[in-house]
Design a protein with these regions (language model features):
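Active-site-adjacent structural elements in enzyme catalytic cores
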Residues: 1-186
Length: 186
């Protein structure tokens, strides 16, 4: 069991994200690289760090209290229909125009996940009040690391803040991906 994260630690992390820093952190799935999904400089830096194609979208972690600012789609209702809060699930949903940089949007949609099973992330997202980029902590095309020790040194050196290895919380596997039409994509 991981020690709880103090509210002062969460606030410091939220402040780092608001300041445009990139973090390496445990998610409800795998270790992720993230930052402010509304900040174009952060998005471009993450794309560059991962050597990622601009055509590949990134997931945003969101909070149920404010997801309505980004989509008119009933994200919370969709999770309730799935009735599997314990299985990390990413939904591809329509996005409201102009609320996120175009680098985060593909064909009018965005991939979002509410990390129900990860208390610290839910608290962090509530503090942030905006989406957090969540992409695996690897160079695009390389194996997704399941443990902190497997993360490439170039990734660790390229971010502004790294969560301690003792903070690992995830399932160590990618989330399930469900399209707007309910079709399982992954």
């Amino acid at each position: 069991m991981n020690p709880p994260i103090a509210s002062s630690e969460l606030q410091q992390l939220a402040d780092r994200i608001h300041a445009g820093q990139i973090i390496l952190y445990p998610t409800d799935t795998v270790r992720g690289i993230g930052g402010d999904a509304t900040n174009i400089k952060v998005i471009k830096r993450i794309i560059e760090l991962k050597h990622r194609s601009l055509s590949k979208t990134m997931i945003c972690l969101v909070h149920p209290d404010w997801i309505g600012r980004y989509t008119s789609y009933d994200v919370v209702g969709s999770y309730q229909k799935l009735d599997q809060y314990d299985v990390p699930t990413t939904l591809v949903v329509p996005i409201l125009l102009g609320v996120l940089p175009e680098e985060m949007v593909r064909e009018g949609t965005i991939a979002v996940r509410i990390p129900w099973s990860c208390d610290y992330l839910m608290s962090l997202l509530a503090l942030l009040g905006k989406p957090l980029i969540s992409t695996s902590a690897n160079i695009s095309g390389h194996r997704t690391p399941s443990r902190y020790e497997d993360i490439e040194l170039s990734i660790i050196r390229s971010v502004d803040w790294v969560a301690p290895p003792s903070r690992d919380t995830g399932t160590h596997q990618s989330s399930r991906l469900i399209g707007v039409d309910g079709q399982v994509l992954r």
